């Protein structure tokens, strides 16, 4: 390897930041159950402590994404505690994730629900999350919507599009300067007939309808088998609509395996598309790289370190491609 190549790698890695998910350090499972790990995080302080360990060993993870209902159950009242923990452990709060899928009222959806009172409940929660983000100095709000239906004819797909457009415009109008709304998509699960935001095109159209501070978030596990994710990334780059990633690997669907454990070449191709765009335009992209994984069998901290290390290695390899 030449001196220039070595310098290229170090320069690329100096700019790479990967956000850790608070929920990735806690006990998680499948619908069949979960295996308890004695070292899994229980409290928000445990999560900050574990994230700090990963950051200490990788040097690339200065922020941790928070899930409001799980990490800040008392909303704004908990922001003071979060600030103290962030200062103590040297890891800042990152993207703020609303929870509009867990409560019983969301059986038929959140902001796509045909019941106006439930749509209002979901929107009120998301607007509260914006205030939490402002209090913590967080830029990105990353809602994932499980909204959809399981059977034909049970919901009006077109009406629900309108509900989403209306609701997301209201959320966008409440964004502070510099804040971003990142819209995630997923083709299926938990809805199996139709999902309201099922692919990148739907997410992009809704983001554009919401306003200029709304972008698309790509979860690498939220795609059909053999789908060309780097082509999706290229389209979003072309339209300047890509805001972030949720990194994980999969064999079949949204398996949430450690990044690069199944298809590292795909991760390389995604990074290559982004770095090629930066080389071609001479502009750095403003993309939030985040992890979203469920470590049911592996140790939590070890799995995070594996993921970050794999991302760094593949990003470095992509940076070495000579576009001339």
Residue ranges and their predicted role:
Residues 129-155, 179-184:
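Active-site groove signature of glycoside hydrolases
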Residues 113-118, 148-159, 187-192:
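Surface-exposed cleft-lining segments at the edges of enzyme active sites
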Residues 1-25, 29, 33-36, 52, ...:
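Histidine-acidic metal/acid-base catalytic patches
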Residues 1-134, 317-324:
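N-terminal pre-domain/capping segments
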Residues 24-26, 68-72, 97-102, 145-149, ...:
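Active-site-proximal loop/turn and secondary-structure-junction residues that shape catalytic pockets
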Residues 59-62, 107-110, 148-150, 183-184, ...:
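A short alpha-helix capping/helix-coil boundary motif
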Residues 38-45, 113, 120, 162, ...:
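Conserved phosphate-coordination/catalytic loops
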Residues 83-94, 115-125, 160-174, 200-209:
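Acidic, His- and aromatic-enriched active-site or binding-groove loops in soluble protein domains
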């Amino acid at each position: 390897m030449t001196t220039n190549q070595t310098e290229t790698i170090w320069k690329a890695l100096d700019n790479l930041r990967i956000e850790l998910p608070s929920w990735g350090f806690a006990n998680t499972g499948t619908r069949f159950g979960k295996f308890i790990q004695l070292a899994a995080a229980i409290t928000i302080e445990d999560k900050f402590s574990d994230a700090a360990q990963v950051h200490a060993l990788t040097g690339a993870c200065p922020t941790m994404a928070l899930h409001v209902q799980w990490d800040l159950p008392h909303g704004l009242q908990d922001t003071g505690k979060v600030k103290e923990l962030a200062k103590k452990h040297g890891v800042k709060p990152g993207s703020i994730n609303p929870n509009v899928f867990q409560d019983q009222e969301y059986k038929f959806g959140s902001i796509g629900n045909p019941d106006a009172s439930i749509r209002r409940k979901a929107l009120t929660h998301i607007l509260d999350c914006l205030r939490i983000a402002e209090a913590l100095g967080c830029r990105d709000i990353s809602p994932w919507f499980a909204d959809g239906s399981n059977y034909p004819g049970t919901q009006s797909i077109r009406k629900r599009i309108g509900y989403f457009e209306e609701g997301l415009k209201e959320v966008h109008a409440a964004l502070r300067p510099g804040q971003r709304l990142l819209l995630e998509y997923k083709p299926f699960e938990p809805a199996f007939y139709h999902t309201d935001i099922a692919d990148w095109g739907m997410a992009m159209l809704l983001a554009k309808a919401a306003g200029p501070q709304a972008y698309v978030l790509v979860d690498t596990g939220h795609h059909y088998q053999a789908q060309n994710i780097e082509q999706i990334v290229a389209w979003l780059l072309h339209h300047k609509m890509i805001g972030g990633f949720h990194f994980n690997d999969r064999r079949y669907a949204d398996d949430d395996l450690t990044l690069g454990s199944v298809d590292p070449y795909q991760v390389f191709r995604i990074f290559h598309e982004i770095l090629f765009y930066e080389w071609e335009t001479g502009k750095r992209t403003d993309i939030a790289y985040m992890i979203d994984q469920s470590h049911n069998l592996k140790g939590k901290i070890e799995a995070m370190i594996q993921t970050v290390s794999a991302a760094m290695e593949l990003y470095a390899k992509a940076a070495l491609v000579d576009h001339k």
